[in-house]
């Protein structure tokens, strides 16, 4: 009799354990489904989140990983993300690269500093904590943090015959180094969140390069081939996240009449043909009228700015049929005659334009101001830095735009 009682007890315990495992599996499945539902998507020419239109106000803070690589400085990352979240900012663009040099993520081709990678892990986990989506860029066009010049130097060190930095786009060694970096980042297992980057909906999008330019071929054809190859490669690794190029918006040869809208020159890109590549999910533009039109008045610069935004919005809506983001803009404190009121007026005008364009179908998805910093980061000052806690009037303008875009997402007619 005792034997049968023990047998029944064992069976009952096994039954309870099986129920527990089933429940745990169900919870994990539900969590994975919830994460999948949290990915920002593209539906035609607008962004969606959980099946509803997604419009945003956001910011750039390129330095997040670099600072977070030193654990004693991570409070600066937390401070900026916390203040940004309080201001309603919901998207942040930052670097997922640092090639060679100080606090390098990639010390040499394929060799990574785990300490710096854990800094990026922290950035992603903090962004998740504060409800901020990330756009992560893979490489720089410029020499800051290594960029394409560092890849070219590495290839030369390996014996490649390279003429200049723009061979980055065509040399098979530099392309393979770059692909290896993409794979390393996309498949990275986050030591804090316990998720692989490619499975984390905190990341809104990948960016191929910060402001790609190619002085060796102004037509945009060389860059077009590179974008096609690299976009296909990214999507082969990760088909959950959105992908964008990182372009400033300069027009090329595909629509010659549009070249008159450029600020007097070309940079080897073609806004239309480059963004027509099907693996590219949305288009971007940048705008620095105080640099591009430095000799002109504030009024003239604003006229250019409005035309720049409107023409790209029209092309995104009618030709590309993809969303558009103003991914960098700002007003430098180093401009002659600068004061904070000038910057606040500039930002208010840009934000009104963004809102007005977004209201018409949601193609204009949002904007990212350059750039937010934390207290005590004077050594990062580039003229465009904004410390929200020290600039209440600017913070108020940013917060108002955040709330306006969030409210508009519930009203916009797609």
From Swiss-Prot:
It holds the Pfam family Cellulase. InterPro entries: Glyco_hydro_5, Glycoside_hydrolase_SF, MAN-like. Substrate binds at residues 95, 210, 288, 370. Residues 1-25 form the signal peptide. One of its GO terms (biological process) is polysaccharide catabolic process. GO terms for cellular component: extracellular region. Keywords: Glycosidase, Hydrolase, Secreted, Signal. Its EC number is 3.2.1.78. The active site is at residues 211, 328. GO terms for molecular function: mannan endo-1,4-beta-mannosidase activity. The keyword rRNA-binding does not apply. It catalyses: Random hydrolysis of (1->4)-beta-D-mannosidic linkages in mannans, galactomannans and glucomannans. It is found in: Secreted. Possesses endo-beta-mannanase activity in vitro. May be involved in seed germination by weakening the endosperm cap prior to radicle emergence. Belongs to the glycosyl hydrolase 5 (cellulase A) family. This is Mannan endo-1,4-beta-mannosidase 2. It comes from Solanum lycopersicum (Tomato). The gene is MAN2.
């Amino acid at each position: 009799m005792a034997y049968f009682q023990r047998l029944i007890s064992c069976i009952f315990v096994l039954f309870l354990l099986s129920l527990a495992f089933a429940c745990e599996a169900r919870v994990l499945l539900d969590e994975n489904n919830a994460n999948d539902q949290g990915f920002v998507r593209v539906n035609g020419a607008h962004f969606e989140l959980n099946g509803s239109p997604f419009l945003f106000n956001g910011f750039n803070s390129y330095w997040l990983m670099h600072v977070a690589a030193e654990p004693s400085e991570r409070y600066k990352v937390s401070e900026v993300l916390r203040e940004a979240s309080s201001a309603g900012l919901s998207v942040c663009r930052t670097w997922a690269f640092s090639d060679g040099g100080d606090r390098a993520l990639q010390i040499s081709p394929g060799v990574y500093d785990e300490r710096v990678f854990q800094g990026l892990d922290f950035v992603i986990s903090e962004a998740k904590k504060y409800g901020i989506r990330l756009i992560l860029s893979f490489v720089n066009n410029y020499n800051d943090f290594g960029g394409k010049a560092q890849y070219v130097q590495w290839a030369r060190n390996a014996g490649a015959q390279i003429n200049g930095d723009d061979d980055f786009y065509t040399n098979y060694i530099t392309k393979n180094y770059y692909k290896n970096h993409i794979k390393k980042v996309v498949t990275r297992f986050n030591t804090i969140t316990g998720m692989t980057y490619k499975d984390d909906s905190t990341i809104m999008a990948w960016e191929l390069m910060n402001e790609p330019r190619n002085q060796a071929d102004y037509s945009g054809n060389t860059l077009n081939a590179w974008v096609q190859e690299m976009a296909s490669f990214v999507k082969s690794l990760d088909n959950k996240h959105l992908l964008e190029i990182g372009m400033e918006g300069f027009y090329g040869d595909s629509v010659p009449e549009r070249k008159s809208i450029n600020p007097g020159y070309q940079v080897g890109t073609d806004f239309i043909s480059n963004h027509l590549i099907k693996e590219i999910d949305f288009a971007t533009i940048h705008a620095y009228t105080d640099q591009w039109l430095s000799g002109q008045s504030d009024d003239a610069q604003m006229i250019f700015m409005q035309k720049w935004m409107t023409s790209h919005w029209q092309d995104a809506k009618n030709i590309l049929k993809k969303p558009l983001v103003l991914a960098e803009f700002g007003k430098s404190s180093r401009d002659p005659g600068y004061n904070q009121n000038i910057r606040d007026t500039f930002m208010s005008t840009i934000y009104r334009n963004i809102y007005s364009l977004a209201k018409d179908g949601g193609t204009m998805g949002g904007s990212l101001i350059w750039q937010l910093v934390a207290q005590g980061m004077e050594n990062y000052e580039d003229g465009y830095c904004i410390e929200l806690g020290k600039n209440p009037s600017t913070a108020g303008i940013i917060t108002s735009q955040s709330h306006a875009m969030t409210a508009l997402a519930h009203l916009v007619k797609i």
